[in-house]
Amino acid sequence: MRIAVICFCLLGIASALPVKPTSSGSSEEKQLNNKYPDAVATWLKPDPSQKQTFLAPQNSVSSEETDDNKQNTLPSKSNESPEQTDDLDDDDDNSQDVNSNDSDDAETTDDPDHSDESHHSDESDEVDFPTDIPTIAVFTPFIPTESANDGRGDSVAYGLKSRSKKFRRSNVQSPDATEEDFTSHIESEEMHDAPKKTSQLTDHSKETNSSELSKELTPKAKDKNKHSNLIESQENSKLSQEFHSLEDKLDLDHKSEEDKHLKIRISHELDSASSEVN
């Protein structure tokens, strides 16, 4: 305890002592201060007029900055018209009302009767959309007309029957018609049926011509095939003969070469035997 008390006393004494400011100047500056104290004092303490000249541009710059800040802040406030502020207030009120309504709805949903009513209302709000009904293609059977005689074997007889029916109907429908009208009607129908008959005849003639041409072409094609087969067989026989002749020649040449080799060997053996005898 004594040591602690002594330490506190020393700290209090040290804090009570005056602190001398350290001179940050160099030794040359200290010498100048000692030699010319008045000149240094006047240099360190300039005239108030000089201070004002130095401070004037700084004050102008600071005033310009403050003016700019004020101008930037003022438009944001001025742009907000009283109507906009009123709208903002109304929005806040509406949001509060909505929140209150939500809370009321949450309270009322706890009632079973209310839940049933809401369910029925939701079902009534639903709209029944029509379902896609598959479209059925209606097939209309082909009803041949009276003048349609194509595709029948008895087209001529059928045409005569249809004409007689037409004439009977025309007589019944117009009993007052004259013979000239009747003849003109027949002529017009004949003119109308003439191109059909000619087309049928041309088709039949084309079919007959095509059948005749096909009959004529088939034997010619057969003859050509036979002739080509004969030529190929002759060429094959010639080639086979030439091949056999070449084989025979090669065999003869090979045999003659073997005979020559044998003769040479025999002559060499005889020479060697005669030399040994000598």
From Swiss-Prot:
Q: What post-translational events are described?
A: Extensively phosphorylated by FAM20C in the extracellular medium at multiple sites within the S-x-E/pS motif. The phosphorylated form inhibits hydroxyapatite crystallization. Dephosphorylation via a mechanism involving ALPL/TNAP promotes hydroxyapatite crystallization.
User: Looking at the UniProt record for this protein, which Gene Ontology cellular component terms does it annotate, in alphabetical order?
Assistant: extracellular region; extracellular space
Residues in coiled coil:
none
Which Pfam families does its entry note?
Osteopontin (PF00865)
Q: List the InterPro entries hit by this protein, alphabetically.
A: Osteopontin (IPR002038), Osteopontin_CS (IPR019841)
Keywords from the UniProt entry = Biomineralization, Cell adhesion, Cytokine, Glycoprotein, Phosphoprotein, Proteoglycan, Secreted, Sialic acid, Signal
Q: Which regions are flagged for Polar residues bias?
A: 49-63, 71-82, 228-243
Amino acid composition bias (Acidic residues), ranges on this chain: 83-95
SMART domains, from UniProt?
A: OSTEO (SM00017)
Single GO molecular function: cytokine activity
State the signal peptide span: 1-16
| Residues linked to a glycan | 131, 140, 145, 205, 272
* Compositionally biased intervals (Basic and acidic residues): 111-122, 182-196, 203-222, 244-271
UniProt-annotated location(s): Secreted
Q: Give residue numbers for the site Not glycosylated.
A: 79, 101, 209
Q: What processes does the entry annotate via GO biological process terms?
A: biomineral tissue development; cell adhesion; osteoblast differentiation; positive regulation of bone resorption
Assembly, in brief, is: Interacts (via N-terminus) with integrin ITGA9:ITGB1.
Hey, which family's this protein in?
A: Belongs to the osteopontin family.
Q: What is this protein called?
A: Osteopontin
Read off the lineage from the record.
Eukaryota, Metazoa, Chordata, Craniata, Vertebrata
**Recorded name of the encoding gene:** SPP1
